[in-house]
Amino acid sequence: MTHVTLPILEDWEGLSLTTILQEKFHLGKKARHEIRMSQNVLLNNKPLDDWNTPLFVGASLSLPVFLHDKIPVYEYDLEIIYEDDFLLVVNKPVDMKTHPNDSYETDTCANAVQYYLEKTGQDANALAVHRLDQTTSGLVLFAKNKLAIAGLSWQMENRAIHRTYLAAVDGTWGLVMQTINKPIGEDRHHGSRRQISPYGQPAVTHVKVLENDKRKKHLSCRMPNRNWSDAPNSRSFKRNWPSNYWRYALWWFPSC
């Protein structure tokens, strides 16, 4: 069984293991029960039986790492931007899906990440924390196990991780900075599309012109209020926002 070893941090001082797993890693009840039943939690290399014991700075906590079923590998060498024991950040190329939606889809970014993990001898999962459109290139966060995906998903949901698009557009964009605050709802003519609608959900996009020349405009678009994919924002504003522009390149990167 694979373990991950963590030092007790200052803001964990005096907290129990139950509290750390629930409030710091945001593990659900089922995942916490799975760890408890394994009887493989170590504190300073000794079994920790009482999960209500206060933990203190300087101690070393070792937790068993549980994995989901692994997906098929796709022999594609992605650009790895960052990696540690819990996560990795990859540069997803254009025209590649983030993750498979059906069992027959095995050529996605997640499958390529699984290939990298197995090629490098890591007993880990390729768990996408978020997704990008197939036609959008940029950085994608992947968690390596259940412990990591729980914490990163919570951060994404609670906006501790932000998304920013860089877009190259053609046409006129007047203001250097502006905020588009238009609700987005379903397009009743196309089930998979979204459009600006008075009955839609709130959607905010902060736009800043980075470069402005005669041929094209480079924009920074930050969308702070969505927790899985910002693609509906960008597509809806492209179709509905009253400005004569056309997006021909898009790059995404996260910031904390």
What are these regions (language model features)?
Residues Y165, I180, A203-T205, L219:
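Structural detector for hydrophobic anchor residues on beta-strands
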Residues I81-Y82, K208-D213, P224:
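Well-ordered beta-strand positions
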Residues I80, V169, H206-V209, N244:
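Conserved hydrophobic positions within beta-strands
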Residues G191-Y199, L210-N212:
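C-terminal amphipathic alpha-helical segment
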Residues P72-Y76, I196-T205:
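Short coil-to-beta-strand transition motifs
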Residues R32, E105-V113, E186, R215-C256:
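Pseudouridine synthase
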Residues P64, D170, G174, L210, ...:
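Solvent-exposed residues in well-ordered beta-strands and their adjoining turns
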Residues M1-T179, P183-R188, K214:
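RNA pseudouridine synthases
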